[in-house]
Design a protein with these regions (language model features):
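Charged phosphate-binding loop/patch that engages nucleotide di/tri-phosphates or the phosphate backbone
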Residues: 4, 12, 141-164
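Short, solvent-exposed loop/turn segments that connect beta-strands within catalytic domains
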Residues: 37-43, 100-103
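Short, acidic/hydrophobic/Gly-rich beta-strand patch recurrent on exposed beta strands
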Residues: 45-48
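A short gly/proline-enriched turn/hairpin at secondary-structure junctions
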Residues: 55-58
């Protein structure tokens, strides 16, 4: 009796991913946007992306723009909030992903941003599924990325310390 031939399986399992031909760095910036509701409680703005993940408004830094300017521009574009103020820099996150044969190394600068007009209505960009103001603890629970969660805790500490 002959052993079964596993040539088809060998071909399948021996396939390798295409090699990385290029490594690119992308700089992005965003903001943890907060406001006080009518009861005086802190609320955090989150946006749900097309994959159903809650996160903060953020995007690519354009030429000639500072990271802080990018954060405020992205908040205006993605959330429709024009009356905002960057309070302070909170930190940065690092993320990497593969785009075919390119390895993308993304660094995102995150700012604490205050919505100056609590009556200004947040309006999502067409690209996003949903936009919503969350109570702080609910936002912390909803956000998908651990590094953003950690910066949200720092944001709350800064908000309380500064009396915003």
């Amino acid at each position: 009796m002959q052993a079964p031939k596993f040539d088809k399986f060998k071909k399948y399992f021996n396939r390798k991913k295409a090699s990385i031909d290029e490594v690119v760095r992308e700089l992005t910036a965003g903001g943890i946007v907060f406001r006080r509701n009518k009861a005086g409680e802190i609320e955090i703005l989150l946006i749900k992306d097309p994959k159903g993940r809650w996160s903060i408004p953020k995007g690519h830094v354009e030429e000639g723009e500072t990271a802080q300017e990018t954060a405020l521009r992205e908040i205006a574009e993605e959330a429709g909030l024009k009356e905002t103020e960057a309070i302070c820099w909170l930190g940065k996150t690092h993320f990497r992903y593969r785009r075919l044969t390119t390895l993308v190394l993304m660094t995102t600068q995150i700012y604490l941003v205050k919505a100056l007009n609590p009556e200004e209505r947040a309006q999502k960009e067409e690209f996003y599924e949903e936009i919503k103001w969350f109570a702080f603890n609910d936002a912390l629970e909803a956000v998908e990325y651990e590094d953003i969660s950690k910066l949200m805790l720092l944001a709350m500490k800064r908000i309380r310390h500064a009396g915003h």
